[in-house]
From Swiss-Prot:
InterPro entries found in the cross-reference section: Ribosomal_bL9, Ribosomal_bL9/RNase_H1_N, Ribosomal_bL9_bac/chp, Ribosomal_bL9_C, Ribosomal_bL9_C_sf, Ribosomal_bL9_N, Ribosomal_bL9_N_sf
Official protein name in the record: Large ribosomal subunit protein bL9
Keyword Lipid biosynthesis: no
GO cellular component: ribonucleoprotein complex; ribosome
The protein's role, per its UniProt record: Binds to the 23S rRNA.
PANTHER family assigned: 50S RIBOSOMAL PROTEIN L9 (PTHR21368)
Species assigned in the record: Borrelia garinii subsp. bavariensis (strain ATCC BAA-2496 / DSM 23469 / PBi)
Family: Belongs to the bacterial ribosomal protein bL9 family.
GO molecular function: rRNA binding; structural constituent of ribosome
One of the protein's GO biological processes: translation
Underlying gene: rplI
Amino acid sequence: MKVILKEDFTNLGREGDTVEVKDGFARNYLLPKGFAVFSNKHNVEIFNQKKRSILKKQETKKQIANDLKSKLDLVKLEFFMKSNDSGKLFHSINSLNIAEELLKLGFDIERKKIDIHHGTLKAFGTYDVTVKLYEGISAIIKVEIKKEKKQEDKKSLNKKLNKVDE
C-alpha cells in the first residue's frame, strides 16, 4: 500500500515522501496514529503544495542540529561511581543516566538518540558516546567514569583539614 508520510521516520522516509508499506502496517499503525495518509490524487496534490514549507522545515531542523552539535561536541560528563575492592562498578552507566546529566546542563536529548557503542559503560575510564541529532548529523560527547571516594577517605581528609585549622 502506498502512503504519504506526515512525519520523518528513521527507516522509512522523510515527511512528504510517498512510500510503499505493508497493508497491515499502514492500516494498524501509520494511518490510525496520523503518521501517514493514503496516497491518492487529492493527497498528492496537497503535499505538492506543501513541499516548499516541508523543505524549509527540514532545513531549519538541520540548522538546529548543526548548532546543537557544535555545543555538544564540547561537553564532557563526569560520573563518580562506587566500586568494590577489585575495581568493579556496582552500577553501570546507560543512556538514561547520560540523558539526565545532559538535561541538567540544559540539553533536552531523547534517550533513544544516545548511542553507547558498548551498550552500557561498566568500567572506569573515558568513553566517546554518540548523540544522533538529525540525518547524518551526530555529536560525540566525552563521558568519564571516576572512582568515588569512600566515606572513610572523606572522614580522614576532614580530620586532617580540622587539624590544620587548629
